From Swiss-Prot:
GO cellular component: plasma membrane; respiratory chain complex I
Self-association state and partner proteins as the record states: NDH-1 is composed of 14 different subunits. Subunits NuoB, C, D, E, F, and G constitute the peripheral sector of the complex.
Coiled-coil regions listed in the entry: none
Keywords: 4Fe-4S, Cell inner membrane, Cell membrane, Iron, Iron-sulfur, Membrane, Metal-binding, NAD, Quinone, Translocase, Transport, Ubiquinone
Name of the featured protein: NADH-quinone oxidoreductase subunit B
Signal peptide segment: none
GN (gene name): nuoB
InterPro entries listed in its UniProt record: NADH_UbQ_OxRdtase-like_20kDa, NADH_UQ_OxRdtase_20Kd_su
Gene3D superfamilies reported in the protein's UniProt record: 3.40.50.12280
Amino acid sequence: MKYTLTRANPDADQYPLQDRQIVTDPLEEEVNKNVFMTRLEDVLHTAVNWGRKNSLWPFNFGTSCCYVEYATTLTGVHDLSRFGAEVIRASPRQADLMIVAGTCFVKMAPVIQRLYEQMLEPKWVISMGACANSGGMYDIYSVVQGVDKIIPVDVYVPGCPPRPEALIQALMLLQDQIQLERRPLSAVIGDDLQPVYKPKMMPERDRKNAQRIAVKNLRSMDEIK
């Protein structure tokens, strides 16, 4: 008499000859529909970041001609209150957003750095204009070749000077970054030197590269306004 050994298949049906349909637990289905399971830390970070990105308080100061466009952005025509950034503060201790609008001179660099240090955490910086980004056309001894040489910058706005719409787009990009950040929920609890995670955002130049290359019919100089 011959014997054959067959290895058990754990994925096989328990009752292969039974035609009865196997359904999931109805209680489990109701729980999945009505109960949202997540970590409390993720919920708190999402809620706190939502509040931070929609209540930015810009610091009202300017270093050069780009401040004219910055002040134009604050007018009612552009309605900056849609983004929760209409509360302009004249004190660095009451602001959390610094917009460096214009040329950063060597004599002005210590002042900007001091003002940045006086701002409380969390704080962000927008570099507005070619001069603030890289010195612009002033490649001379008296101009700092980029404000990021003295303070960290989150968003760069190109242009000389940039239009108010460009600054609004920079504000929206900063809001996207703030939503993905992970900061200590409280400076009272835990160590003061807790790490701060800032996501690495893709530059708009790279994100819209394929869209620009796909354009074949360019407008003439007379049509550009």
